[in-house]
Amino acid sequence: FNTYYRDNDLYEVVAFTAAQIPDIAGRKYPAELAGKLYPKGIPIYAESDLTGLIREHQVDDCVFSYSDVSYTRVMNLSAIVHSAGANFILLGPRDTMVKSVKPLISVCATRTGCGKSQTSRKVIELLMAKGLKVVAIRHPMPYGDLVRQKVQRFATLEDLAFHECTIEEMEEYEPHVVRWNVIYAGVDNEAILRAVRRHPLALL
């Protein structure tokens, strides 16, 4: 949404759906993040409401944007969308990736629990051993105030308290902080990349 639809007046985004992470459905993607085309924000519904939303709003396109899912899961959702009468869209990298001006290594996986965090920390360890300064960027855990979570920077243990991190977030960020490795998170990757440009470093 942020990279392709937020400022694109050719489209009207009527809703997001949520799955896996609890307590997101029933909230709104706030106006402060949604941009000038959405002064009231954008409502977030449970994925189980998908078929009804398509019919209620006469939706033309449903854009799949979840992470950590299998091919089977994606195709099952495409069948649900098509049976409700909408197009099922997968945007490509040119429309979704944000250009980095720093050297960048990405660590990805098909599902939660594959070991992305451990792999990332090992890669950082190897790069730091070569004398490189590395900053980590992690996708957010959107449990709290999304506006406050636009750009989060963690460099000290005090930052964990300042950002009111959950136990899950602390488990993720603390291993970076205790070895003096800065980690960023947040819901706006473009804003995060602008924030880290001043660092003479590589990104993970």
Question: Where would I find each of the regions flagged by the language model?
Answer:
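Phosphate-bearing ligand-interacting subdomains
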Residues: 29-94
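ATP-dependent carboxylate-amine ligase catalytic core
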Residues: 126-204
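N-terminal beta-loop-helix "entrance" segment that forms/cooperates
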Residues: 19-41, 145-150
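Walker A (P-loop) phosphate-binding motif
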Residues: 96-144
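Short internal beta-strands
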Residues: 12-23, 137-138
